[in-house]
């Protein structure tokens, strides 16, 4: 629908502040472009002036000042609480006013210039239609029959109060003509908001939420422009136009009315006989249909608890499409399993859910599957997960829009073209808060601002009709979403290793890869992994004791300069900032006082002056402990110096927390805290570090505290503070979560949720996040030891070697990298040798060797290893190998290395000298991302990018365009390897099961006696993951070990 308008001044004095000067009216005109444009947007034909207003109901409201060519009356003014995306005009006729939509002429066609959505009820539309019929004898069909009415809008004298949007044909007569013209006004959900008169063509790929630059046109005279405020002018002659989404009306009364339409189509199954009859139809009459299913659950904190062995199924719904009739026009099934005979009713559906022939579609299959499995039913016939289909269609929605059923079905881009007129009124999942939310009562009985939702069991019993409709809508929306995603994926070509797969689409990819992968992930979640909770409890004691020691060490050091620091809260950024940066000014010229009082818990029961007994809290005075404020380049959003981990590490440098002032720091003994002698203390606590003589390892605090012993002491003390933070992270993120009952089932195994919800396709995990285990060198408490095999079993842990670098070598066709991988050995040492001539010369002269494989009895190499003799060069080579694969630039590397950008660029150029294919490939991907808006992985999954609006965003897109094919292709390889392992019949017969995938490694569990056989099979599956082949131009290196716990297998 065309979106052209023209601009004039207002006759209404209340609206004049929205217009430019009344002496200036744009007369610019241009033809509509014949070039292909997005279906939801056409170029502006005339000028538009809109001003964004505040909203009272959470929707976006607009006031528009515009008039159609041929009319001379100002636009109708809407209130700010109304979603208004169109243009109306008030026409004066015999002292009465008639509201008509604005039109334009395009050739011989007359079109409504814009679209709108106005509030009201269906009955209000029907009433106006009947009035029209009575007055003019024209046809006005009942809106319940999906109709619309013809004729002029009824004469009105004030703003209408409709609360729904319908497709309506209007008849009107443009000024100066005698012939009536009919135009159709359709409800649309996309519109333009602009803050100045413009004529512009939208860019390719314009999307909801995007901005585009526009230029004012007209008579070439610069005029004041309306800004986002009620007064003021826009700067310059360019402004931003935001493409905005107009939401459906979510007034509770209107929502419930629409839900009522669903209720009439729902068959309620709440007894055993009805269950038997329904199941008979499902497995026979409608056996060949696609069935969408959804559950409703009580007794579970979804964001905190695993659904494995948690949650109680209270009802579920099944929908096979509108053509499936279960009697009296009922097309959707809603099953009540909350009542007294609920378990018996559910048991009748067991054959249905376990029928592998019946194709079942779910939204978030993982959750529903575990909930139903909790009741002794193993689901078969998994056909699709619409959440995964949507992620495959557009991986960028994770950041903007999301993948919830509500977000997807409310988005016109997602369901566009798959809805009937009637479905458009109610399809689109509505949040529970909108339907069932009630304002929490205050103590005085009045309503507060907080909206709460009653327990779902209460809703099912007491608000039954609305609850049934809400539940059934999930299944209906899921099937419509499946139909839409099926069509969208069918329109996406499938590319394998950069080449199109003839006659195949991404829907084929989904069914061949992501559908079985999604089912495999659910099985892995159900398996879980056993954790040794006794071990976790023991290392928790050790960690807390070491944290207490490190904290006391820091406090006692700080108290030498500020006595009250002994009582400070070292977890408070405010107190630490006062201690390190007191007296400094921020970017807003606000000064942090040199000293300040803080209230802290009175742990030592100190009786303050003037008090007779100790109070719960006491005041302490903190002041800056250095002679001058410490320097830093890191600041918070408010302009104050940051005291985060990076800043503290910069102050401390690369020194140990251990120092000879330990003796007078604390009398806490680890042996007193940890009673079990078998528990190992951390490596750093076992031994003290010798006093360094080389001051280059010390941080900026060394100079700030005058150097010498005083400066060293400061750095070691701040390192102790870093240790406190590090230990706290290990306790809160790893040790404690693994012990929680919320993440484990009845068998004591941890069941995390595995998700394909990253933009590259990498797996993520939550409840708990097992993907985020600490690096081995930072795992001071050996947390991986807690992941163990059950009695009689063992673990096989298999890990890819340098997977992403091998992917990069294949994608780019880089000969140097492929030769290095073919030669084997230390890849990073070979990179350093190729980068630095002096390193190569040392290797060629035999002064160093790349790697060494000792023979029995040999304890050291004949000459130094390259990694020992040229450690600095190798470290830079290693960093570059990974950084360039991730799209990092010389600017970022200069910050990491603390060198100039020029020096970093010179090192980067050394890396590229022998790898020109990589640079060429990267430039192609950058261009592809900007011009086409997406890049592809090895198996053809796409990552979309928005149009870049700034240099920073463009740089981010270009880095992602380099990283995504590498990291996404690595995810493709890992997925294929897991599928190969899962279908291997020998592993199944031996009793081996996949438990986890953590980045590039997989963990399996099975009988001890077949461990070596299983390990060899796993290595073979991973090295040839593509149906028993390796399609890459480099070998896939796999290292595997058998052990009783994860740590021992590393």
UniProtKB/Swiss-Prot annotation:
Q: What is its EC number?
A: 2.7.7.7
Establish whether keyword Chloroplast is in the entry: yes
Q: Where is the 3'-5' exonuclease domain?
A: 312-490
Transit peptide span, please give it.
1-91
Under InterPro entries, the record lists: 3'-5'_exonuclease_dom, DNA-dir_DNA_pol_A_palm_dom, DNA/RNA_pol_sf, DNA_polymerase_A, RNaseH-like_sf, RNaseH_sf
Stretches of the chain forming a coiled coil according to its record: none
Q: What happens when the gene is disrupted?
A: Retarded growth and reduced levels of DNA in both mitochondria and plastids. Double homozygous mutants polIa and polIb are sterile.
Which reactions does this protein catalyse? DNA(n) + a 2'-deoxyribonucleoside 5'-triphosphate = DNA(n+1) + diphosphate
Q: Among the entry's GO cellular component annotations, what is one?
A: chloroplast
Write out the biased-composition intervals (Polar residues): 228-240
Using the UniProt annotation, give all residue ranges assigned to the region (Disordered).
202-240, 673-694
Principal cellular location given in the protein's record: plastid
Where does it localize? Plastid, Chloroplast; Mitochondrion
Keyword Amino-acid biosynthesis among UniProt keywords: no
Q: Where is this region: Polymerase?
A: 717-1048
Single GO term (MF): DNA-directed DNA polymerase activity
- Activity regulation: Not inhibited by aphidicolin.
One Pfam family, short name = DNA_pol_A
CDD domains with a match to the protein in the record: DNA_pol_A_plastid_like, DNA_polA_I_Ecoli_like_exo
Highest rank taxon of the organism: Eukaryota
What keywords are annotated for this sequence in UniProt?
Answer: Chloroplast, DNA damage, DNA repair, DNA replication, DNA-binding, DNA-directed DNA polymerase, Exonuclease, Hydrolase, Mitochondrion, Nuclease, Nucleotidyltransferase, Plastid, Transferase, Transit peptide
A single Gene Ontology biological process assigned to it is: mitochondrial DNA replication
Q: What is known about the tissue distribution of this protein?
A: Expressed in shoot apical meristem.
Q: What does this protein do?
A: In addition to polymerase activity, this DNA polymerase exhibits 5'-3' exonuclease activity. Required for DNA replication and accumulation in plastids and mitochondria. May be required for DNA repair in both organelles.
In the record, the note on similarity to other proteins reads: Belongs to the DNA polymerase type-A family.
Q: What is this protein called?
A: DNA polymerase I A, chloroplastic/mitochondrial
Q: Which organism is it from?
A: Arabidopsis thaliana
Instruction: Please name the gene that encodes this protein.
Output: POLIA
């Amino acid at each position: 629908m065309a979106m052209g308008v023209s601009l004039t001044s207002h006759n209404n004095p209340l609206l004049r502040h929205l217009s430019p000067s009344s002496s200036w009216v744009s007369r610019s005109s241009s033809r509509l472009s014949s070039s292909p444009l997005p279906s939801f947007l056409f170029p502006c034909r005339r000028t538009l002036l809109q001003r964004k207003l505040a909203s009272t109901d959470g929707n976006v409201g607009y006031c528009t000042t515009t008039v159609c060519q041929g009319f001379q009356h100002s636009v109708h003014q809407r209130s700010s609480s109304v979603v208004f995306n169109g243009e109306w005009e008030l026409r004066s006729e015999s002292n009465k006013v008639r509201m008509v939509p604005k039109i334009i002429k395009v050739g011989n066609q007359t079109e409504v210039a814009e679209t709108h959505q106005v509030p009201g009820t269906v009955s209000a539309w029907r009433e106006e239609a009947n009035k029209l019929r009575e007055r003019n004898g024209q046809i006005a069909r009942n809106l319940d029959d999906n109709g619309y009415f013809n004729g002029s809008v009824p004469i009105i004298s004030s703003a209408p109060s409709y609360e729904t949007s319908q497709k309506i044909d209007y008849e009107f007569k443009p000024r100066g003509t005698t012939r009536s013209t009919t135009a159709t006004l359709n409800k649309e959900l996309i519109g333009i908001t602009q803050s100045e008169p413009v004529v512009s063509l939208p860019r390719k790929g314009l999307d909801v939420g995007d901005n585009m630059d526009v230029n004012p046109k007209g008579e070439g005279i610069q005029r004041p422009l309306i800004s986002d405020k009620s007064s003021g002018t826009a700067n310059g002659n360019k402004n931003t136009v935001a493409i905005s989404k107009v939401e459906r009306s979510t007034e509770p009364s209107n929502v419930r009315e629409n839900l009522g339409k669903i209720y009439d189509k729902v068959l309620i199954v709440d007894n055993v006989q009805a269950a038997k009859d329904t199941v008979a139809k499902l497995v026979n009459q409608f056996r060949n249909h696609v069935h969408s299913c959804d559950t409703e659950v009580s007794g579970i904190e979804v964001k905190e608890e695993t659904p494995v062995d948690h949650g109680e199924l209270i009802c579920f719904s099944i929908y096979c499409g509108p053509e499936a009739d279960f009697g009296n026009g009922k097309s959707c099934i809603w099953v009540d399993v909350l009542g007294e005979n609920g378990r018996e009713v559910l048991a009748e559906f067991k054959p249905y859910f376990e029928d592998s022939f019946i194709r079942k579609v779910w939204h978030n299959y993982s959750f529903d599957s575990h909930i139903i499995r909790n009741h002794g039913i193993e689901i078969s016939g998994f056909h699709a997960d619409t959440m995964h289909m949507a992620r495959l269609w557009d991986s960028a929605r994770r950041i903007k829009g999301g993948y919830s059923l509500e977000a997807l079905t409310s988005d016109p881009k997602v369901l566009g073209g798959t809805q009937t007129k009637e479905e458009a009124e109610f399809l689109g999942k509505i949040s529970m808060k909108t339907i069932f939310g009630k304002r929490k009562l205050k103590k005085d009985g009045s309503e507060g601002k907080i909206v709460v939702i009653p327990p779902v069991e209460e809703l099912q019993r007491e608000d039954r009709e609305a609850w049934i409709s809400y539940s059934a809508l999930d299944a209906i929306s899921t099937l419509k979403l499946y139909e839409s995603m099926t069509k969208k994926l069918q329109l996406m070509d499938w590319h394998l290793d950069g080449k199109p797969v003839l006659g195949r689409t991404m829907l084929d990819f989904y069914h061949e890869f992501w559908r079985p992968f999604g089912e495999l992930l659910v099985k892995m979640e159900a398996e879980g992994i056993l954790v040794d909770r006794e071990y976790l409890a023991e290392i928790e004691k050790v960690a807390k004791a070491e944290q207490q020691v490190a904290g006391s060490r820091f406090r006692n050091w700080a108290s030498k300069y500020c006595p009250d620091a002994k009582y400070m809260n070292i977890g408070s950024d405010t107190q630490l900032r006062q201690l390190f940066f007191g007296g400094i000014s921020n970017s807003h010229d606000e000064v942090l006082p040199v000293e300040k009082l803080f209230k802290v818990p009175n742990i030592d029961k100190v009786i303050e002056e003037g008090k007779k007994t100790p109070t719960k809290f006491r005041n302490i005075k903190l002041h800056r402990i250095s002679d001058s404020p410490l320097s830093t380049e890191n600041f918070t959003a408010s302009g104050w110096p940051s005291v985060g981990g990076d800043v503290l590490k910069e102050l401390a440098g690369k020194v140990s927390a251990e120092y000879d002032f330990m003796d007078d720091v604390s009398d806490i003994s680890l042996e007193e805290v940890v009673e079990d002698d078998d528990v190992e203390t951390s490596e750093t606590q076992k031994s003290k570090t010798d006093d360094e003589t080389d001051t280059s390892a010390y941080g900026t605090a060394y100079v700030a505290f005058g150097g010498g012993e005083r400066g060293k002491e400061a750095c070691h003390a701040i390192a102790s503070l870093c240790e406190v933070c590090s230990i706290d992270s290990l306790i809160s993120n790893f040790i404690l979560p693994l012990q929680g009952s919320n993440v484990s089932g009845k068998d004591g195994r941890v069941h995390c949720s595995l998700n394909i919800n990253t933009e590259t396709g990498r797996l993520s995990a939550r409840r708990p996040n097992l993907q985020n285990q600490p690096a081995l060198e930072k795992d001071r408490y050996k947390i991986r030891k807690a992941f163990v095999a059950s009695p009689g079993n063992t673990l096989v842990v298999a890990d890819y070697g340098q997977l992403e670098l091998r992917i990069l070598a294949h994608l780019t066709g880089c000969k140097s990298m492929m030769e290095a991988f073919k030669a084997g050995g230390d890849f990073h040492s070979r990179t350093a040798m190729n980068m630095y001539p002096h390193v190569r010369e040392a290797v060629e002269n035999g002064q160093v060797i790349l790697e060494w494989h000792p023979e029995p009895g040999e304890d050291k190499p004949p000459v130094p290893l390259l990694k020992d003799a040229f450690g600095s060069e190798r470290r830079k080579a290693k960093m570059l190998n990974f950084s360039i694969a991730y799209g990092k630039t010389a600017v970022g590397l200069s910050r990491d290395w603390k060198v100039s950008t020029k020096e970093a660029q010179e090192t980067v150029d050394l890396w590229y000298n022998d790898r020109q294919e990589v640079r060429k490939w990267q430039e192609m991907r950058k261009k592809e991302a900007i011009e086409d808006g997406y890049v592809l992985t090895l198996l053809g999954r796409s990552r979309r990018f928005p149009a870049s609006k700034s240099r920073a965003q463009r740089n981010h897109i270009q880095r992602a365009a380099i990283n995504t094919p590498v990291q996404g292709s690595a995810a493709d390889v890992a997925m294929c390897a897991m599928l190969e392992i899962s279908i291997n019949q020998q592993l199944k017969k031996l009793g081996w099961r996949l438990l986890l995938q953590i980045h590039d490694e997989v963990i399996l569990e099975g009988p001890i006696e077949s461990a070596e056989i299983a390990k060899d099979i796993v290595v073979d599956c991973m090295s040839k993951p593509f149906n028993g082949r390796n399609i890459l131009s480099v070998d896939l290196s796999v290292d595997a070990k058998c052990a009783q716990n994860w740590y021992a297998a590393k």
